[in-house]
Amino acid sequence: MAKKPSKKKVKRQVASGRAYIHASYNNTIVTITDPDGNPITWSSGGVIGYKGSRKGTPYAAQLAALDAAKKAMAYGMQSVDVIVRGTGAGREQAIRALQASGLQVKSIVDDTPVPHNGCRPKKKFRKAS
């Protein structure tokens, strides 16, 4: 039986999209989506090759953002709206890395979830105030 000729998968071209930066104390995850919110590519401190507490460093966040931006530019991405969630160490560095990668950053929105006095925080987070 003859083999069917396989069709080449065509990479869809997306000119603009959104970059979600989830910065926790343990890691920073950068997800780049199209304008509808469908993921195109993502990267994190762990994907870069760091393990343990090093994933939460600003340098790991910078490398993760550069990696995600490079992958997104392969899809024709030129500009992004940045949405930041979390209070981790890598949030500022990830934004700077996206700007330095060649992607045009149109806007930056802080969408960190803040409770309206919901669950009681753990002891280490109650001690602060």
Curated annotation (Swiss-Prot):
Coiled coil: none
InterPro entries: Ribosomal_uS11, Ribosomal_uS11_bac-type, Ribosomal_uS11_CS, Ribosomal_uS11_sf
Gene3D superfamilies: Ribosomal protein S11 (3.30.420.80)
Keywords assigned: Ribonucleoprotein, Ribosomal protein, RNA-binding, rRNA-binding
Stored Pfam families: Ribosomal_S11
Ranges of compositional bias, category Basic residues: 119-129
GO CC annotations on file: ribonucleoprotein complex; ribosome
Recorded GO MF terms: rRNA binding; structural constituent of ribosome
Region Disordered, residue ranges: 109-129
GO biological process terms, semicolon-separated: translation
Assembly, per entry: Part of the 30S ribosomal subunit. Interacts with proteins S7 and S18. Binds to the C-terminus of IF-3; however exactly how IF-3 interacts with the 30S subunit is unclear. May contact the C-terminus of Era.
Function per UniProt: Located on the upper part of the platform of the 30S subunit, where it bridges several disparate RNA helices of the 16S rRNA. Forms part of the Shine-Dalgarno cleft in the 70S ribosome, where it interacts both with the Shine-Dalgarno helix and mRNA.
Family: Belongs to the universal ribosomal protein uS11 family.
HAMAP family from the UniProt entry: Ribosomal_uS11 (MF_01310)
Protein name: Small ribosomal subunit protein uS11
